[in-house]
Swiss-Prot record:
InterPro entries, sorted: Mrt4, Ribosomal_uL10, Ribosomal_uL10-like_insert, Ribosomal_uL10-like_insert_sf, Ribosomal_uL10-like_sf, Ribosome_Assembly_uL10
Protein name: Ribosome assembly factor mrt4
Known role: Component of the ribosome assembly machinery. Nuclear paralog of the ribosomal protein P0, it binds pre-60S subunits at an early stage of assembly in the nucleolus, and is replaced by P0 in cytoplasmic pre-60S subunits and mature 80S ribosomes.
Keyword Protein transport: no
Keyword Nucleus (UniProt): yes
Chain's gene name: mrt4
Subunit text: Associates with the pre-60S ribosomal particle.
SUPFAM superfamilies: Ribosomal protein L10-like
Lineage, highest ranks first: Eukaryota, Fungi, Dikarya, Ascomycota, Pezizomycotina
Compartments (UniProt record): Nucleus, Nucleolus; Cytoplasm
Gene Ontology cellular component list: cytoplasm; nucleolus; nucleoplasm; preribosome, large subunit precursor; small-subunit processome
Amino acid sequence: MPKSKRAKVYNLTQVTKKNREQKEKLFENIRECIPNYQHCFVFSIDNMRNNYLKDVRKELNDCRIFFGKTKLTARALGTTPEDAQADGLDKLSKYLSGSVGLIFTNRDPSEIKDYFVNLTQVDFARAGSVATRTITIPSGPLYSTGGEVPAEHDVPVSHTLEPELRRLGMPTRMVKGKVCLGDEAGEGDDYVICKEGETLDSRQTRLLKLFSICLSEFRVKLLAYWSAASGEVTELEKPGEAGAEEMEEDDE
């Protein structure tokens, strides 16, 4: 009789060891940066997207950017004047909560601030995000942007999408070869995909994507920075919850 898979014992020692080694490496890498860089920024990210963060790393390739556990990051910098790894560095600890990261740099702080002020990327919203505006699809023939641009500058929705639109809850139908809400003359109710301020589910985000409507904006917020020369921390935003999720461990 073959051995039951349920009876199989999985050894988790190796996984635990790997995680511990990653944390130790992150801790050491942060501490190694402290004497080699003039400034350390704490930042948070709205609507995290790995591909956009890679662009940031490429642009700031002479800096070091860390994403890691906030408690570990705080310990690496020091949380009190007694254990701070440099004068005043412990003052950054109050900004290390939620989904935040560190940027070590020798660039002038004004250059870093200017770069991030001008950095925004729009993207499709994900489930769990909050709608930034109300999206209403007008009745009548459907167009690819759902009324976001005038019909004369848009193209009709492909008939192949009609079954999926219906499956996602839109009361669509085919009228003379066109995908319509109501009838071709526009008689019928408009369809509200989402209302401003509501939390989006996967059905709503799929509909938004089908109509090429972007409600998400990738943005980096600089919260504060420490300067080695003065030992002072300059606040750029009031400390608070930068995000509910812990940061991923990444020290590249």
